[in-house]
């Protein structure tokens, strides 16, 4: 996937990898972080080295460097600090996480396969691999899929939803469903 910000160069392509005190992750991001510049400066002050000009790398470094006893606490800290729109898929050494911004600007869904779970930004991706739609990741929710199964690890309450008006018109494929509504 091409970067959400920064130039469309190979080094900005996703997934973005980051390694820090919390382990190593690979992250895919749909959206834009509007407070990226001050967060980047702060992370550089912590000793984080940036290889891209992408806001996705800022999110990845936050997750691998913010304090917290577990992924739920780290995601909570990250979500309190980020401003903007984001749907994230994060791969750790033993789990996959799906994280959606508090306003639900970008879609994110969970699918079920016979052998496990899938996280995707659109339901049409589920169709291509034979997965069935399970549910949307709610605005402000972070889910994790690990050896314990699928569960919510953080839920930030927010009044209302602010889905992007261009999602259904320009971005989404016509064979997708977003927020439980068919696009076509």
Please give the residue ranges for each predicted region:
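Conserved short alpha-helical segments that host acidic/polar catalytic motifs at enzyme active sites
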Residues: 1-139, 144-184
